[in-house]
Amino acid sequence: MPADSFAALGRRGFVMTSLMTGFTLAAARADAAPIHTDSRGLVVGEVQMPVADGQLPAYFARPAGVTHPPVVIVIEEIFGVHEYIRDVCRRLAHQGYFAVAPELYARLADLSKMTDPQEIFTQVILKAPDATLLSDLSHAVDWAIAEGGDAGRIATLGFCRGGRDVWLFAEHEARLKAAVAFYGPVAGPTSAIQPRNPIDMAAELRCPLLGLYGGQDPSIQPADVYAAAARAKAAGQTVDIVYYPDAGHGFHADYRPSYNRADAEAAWARALAWLRRYDIG
């Protein structure tokens, strides 16, 4: 990212200096019974992770007593690194992974205080430069390796907007060995700070990618997803797209009304199998 762009963000400062507790106010339902994964046998915590213009809050979970565990960079939804994303990290850690989830929007807003998803999207997400996001994710890889993660076994997994960012990161970061995108758009409007969509860069994909999508999700067009996959495959990369016909957007998010338990469990099993298939685990 150009130095002046980082400088501008640095002058603005980091709005979030620590992670939120509990679930996001913007999407959680009152009657939800979300999954809770305990931390027994794990090392978990918050860190201030070094990035190009300062430090970024992040959550991590890793198996205790394991030398050089494989690394999974977990990319949040638009709602921040709240309890659902933390729980995903713990689920991965129980499978033997060193999971790291950076709070990618800490420079722009305290997402724990925002309640309107549309406001989050327009006032935060669309104002976050992709170049900064990708730099932060690469710094998360650096941090995990410095903390003992296996430099030869690195993957990424993300949800919602983070699914879109999984595609971009897999097109950017040469150290990735596998990627898993839970929904997330691959096409849409662009801007000066978000100049390209995943579909535009699909031929540049650097690792095998699994895409998991809901057939009842009106926000993502299957034609776009399959077109992105076709471009990647034409360039010699491996992409597997799976649609769950009865699932909507956010079907894996157990704290949201969109949660579909059967499809969430099936998709999670497929995601873990994908990581193992490419020796990430």
Model segments located where?
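N-terminal secretory signal peptides
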Residues: 1-9
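N-terminal export leaders
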Residues: 9-24
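N-terminal cap/lid segment of alpha/beta-hydrolase-fold proteins
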Residues: 33-64
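Short beta-strand element of the alpha/beta-hydrolase
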Residues: 68-77
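Gly/Ser-rich "nucleophile elbow"/oxyanion-hole loop immediately N-terminal to the catalytic nucleophile
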Residues: 115-155, 280
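Primarily recognizes the serine-hydrolase "nucleophile elbow" in alpha/beta-hydrolase
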Residues: 139-200
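Short beta-strand/loop motif that positions the catalytic acidic residue
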Residues: 205, 211-213
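C-terminal catalytic histidine-bearing segment of alpha/beta-hydrolase fold enzymes
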Residues: 236-281
